[in-house]
């Protein structure tokens, strides 16, 4: 077989404090992160939010050393994966494509084109599929494929999600068991799975399978672990006033404290690498919430990073994908009518020309209100914590 390329997809993260604001701008410019009825509002709103949130976000990054370790960890994962694939008989070139910071997905694709690969496996480093993570990267890649004849000549296949892969589950169970066994009474420890949240509307209205895959993944990990511990699944990182998946991590921690839980082991189930949401949000913010709730012992399972069983899981996923019929963008992004990727299926306001005129006027009023709030520093978005 010809040399195989493997494109690892991930979020990306600012490597120094100066990167924080442009990183946030890229993040909030993504219509899969903030869905707006009018695409022309996307970048002005992203500029507004990134301008107002950058200082607070920089303070958070200062608490973990001044930048995200995500790129270095992903590079280590890529190196380990290339080595493991070589051990099982595959000559592979690994590429890294980050969605919101360097090396961007576009940079990875440029390298792939220069290397003139014929076969490519696209592997997101998100175990569970979501419109806002893997889906967002797939959407960008699909647009690039549709516009570039050179890319159309590449035989590619996607691995949409792999939350139920036995080797991945074994790696997660191994890390949990290691942390439990450090405790005086392992069976008394409450296992707390904290997943990155998404707006409830993504599941209810857009058909995102993320919640179902997270819940199934949690059950499978506990089955693989085969311990009698009680456990909870909650969702972190909520932003803004809209309802997100529940229970929220901070609320669940308070409730467990009220129930008398003394020993808690947090498992970051959405993340395979250490980054701001494990090192700062869980280790610092949620630790404080737990302590205030009366939970005496707060432990955390480390992210998978380059755990050998996890790397073997990725290698086997790549191998399996090469033996099966290819999985295409169309199969994953547009599998059924009730899963809606933006902007291919934009929200439509109004059925008549007159209605659309009023929609435009309302949008302009809303944008002016945003600018006024930016200048004054006061308003409903500040009140609810979005800005």
From Swiss-Prot:
Chief location of this protein within or outside the cell = cytoplasm
Q: Which GO terms describe its biological process?
A: heme biosynthetic process
- Where does the record say this protein resides? Cytoplasm
Is Translocase set as a keyword in this record?
A: no
> Gene3D superfamilies in the record, alphabetically?
3.40.50.1400
Quickly give the catalysed reaction.
heme b + 2 H(+) = protoporphyrin IX + Fe(2+)
UniProt-listed Enzyme Commission number(s): 4.98.1.1
Tell me which domain of life the UniProt entry assigns to the organism this sequence originates from. Answer: Bacteria
- Pfam families (UniProt xref): Ferrochelatase (PF00762)
Q: Which PROSITE patterns match?
A: FERROCHELATASE
Q: Which GO terms describe its cellular component?
A: cytoplasm
Q: What class of enzyme is it?
A: lyase
Q: Name one GO molecular function term.
A: ferrochelatase activity
Sorted alphabetically, which InterPro entries does this protein's record hold? Ferrochelatase, Ferrochelatase_AS, Ferrochelatase_C, Ferrochelatase_N
Ordered alphabetically, the record's keywords are: Cytoplasm, Heme biosynthesis, Iron, Lyase, Metal-binding, Porphyrin biosynthesis
Binding positions for Fe cation per the UniProt entry: 196, 277
Q: Which pathway is this protein engaged in?
A: Porphyrin-containing compound metabolism; protoheme biosynthesis; protoheme from protoporphyrin-IX: step 1/1
* Biological role stated in the UniProt entry: Catalyzes the ferrous insertion into protoporphyrin IX.
Please report which protein family the annotation says this sequence is part of.
Belongs to the ferrochelatase family.
State the protein's name.
Answer: Ferrochelatase
Which gene is transcribed and translated to give this protein? hemH
